[in-house]
Amino acid sequence: MRIGTGYDLHRLVKGRRLVLGGVALPFEKGLDGHSDADVLVHAVCDALLGAAGLGDIGDHFPDTDARFKGVSSLLLLTETGRMLKEKGFFVVNIDATVLAQAPKLGAHKAAMAANMATALGIDAACVNVKATTTEGLDAVGRGEAMAAMSVALIIEEEARDSRGQGAG
């Protein structure tokens, strides 16, 4: 059993679309970044990569690589899942929190979780998404940025098979 954590923060800017957990949200600003800047998916990728001892998102999908310009972060998550599977790991569960002053995200959390579960090929019940504000404090609270945190639990495939545990 291995546990990893992930964190990401991106600046909010006009002229970009807002994507969280692969869901395009109506909002006057979007997250600035090389890919679609989906902070939620980026935090989840980092948690999974860290749990597997595979470095971080920047090691595998650098913002200096033109192949990742504007790419959907769900594709990065799918590739992260493939890397874990190749190393013999299985995702047991993911718990993630988005920090955003606005917009309200409650109605979109299930879709975000479902998108990430689909990208990883696991049951949606194994992915939990929460949302909170920072009560007007810091860059997130001032509406200048959004952030996300994630924790992931993975096991080796042999452990899953022998104990009958795991998602899916």
Curated annotation (Swiss-Prot):
- Please give the cofactor(s) recorded in the UniProt entry for this protein: a divalent metal cation
- GO MF entry, a single one: metal ion binding
Q: Which UniProt keywords apply?
A: Isoprene biosynthesis, Lyase, Metal-binding
**Family label:** Belongs to the IspF family.
The positions annotated for binding 4-CDP-2-C-methyl-D-erythritol 2-phosphate are: 8-10, 34-35, 56-58, 61-65, 132-135, 142
SUPFAM superfamilies in UniProt: IpsF-like
GO biological-process terms attached to the record: isopentenyl diphosphate biosynthetic process, methylerythritol 4-phosphate pathway; terpenoid biosynthetic process
List the catalysed reactions: 4-CDP-2-C-methyl-D-erythritol 2-phosphate = 2-C-methyl-D-erythritol 2,4-cyclic diphosphate + CMP
The record's section on HAMAP family has: IspF
InterPro entries xrefs: MECDP_synthase, MECDP_synthase_CS, MECDP_synthase_sf
Query: Pathway, per Swiss-Prot/TrEMBL?
Result: Isoprenoid biosynthesis; isopentenyl diphosphate biosynthesis via DXP pathway; isopentenyl diphosphate from 1-deoxy-D-xylulose 5-phosphate: step 4/6
> Origin organism of this chain?
Desulfosudis oleivorans (strain DSM 6200 / JCM 39069 / Hxd3) (Desulfococcus oleovorans)
Q: Which sites bind a divalent metal cation?
A: D8, H10, H42
Kindly give the PROSITE patterns that the UniProt entry links to this protein.
ISPF
Q: Where is this site: Transition state stabilizer?
A: H34, T133
What is its biological role? Involved in the biosynthesis of isopentenyl diphosphate (IPP) and dimethylallyl diphosphate (DMAPP), two major building blocks of isoprenoid compounds. Catalyzes the conversion of 4-diphosphocytidyl-2-C-methyl-D-erythritol 2-phosphate (CDP-ME2P) to 2-C-methyl-D-erythritol 2,4-cyclodiphosphate (ME-CPP) with a corresponding release of cytidine 5-monophosphate (CMP).
Name of the protein described by the UniProt record: 2-C-methyl-D-erythritol 2,4-cyclodiphosphate synthase
EC number(s): the record gives 4.6.1.12
Cofactor binding: number and manner: Binds 1 divalent metal cation per subunit.
Assembly information from the UniProt record: Homotrimer.
Which Pfam families does the entry link to? YgbB
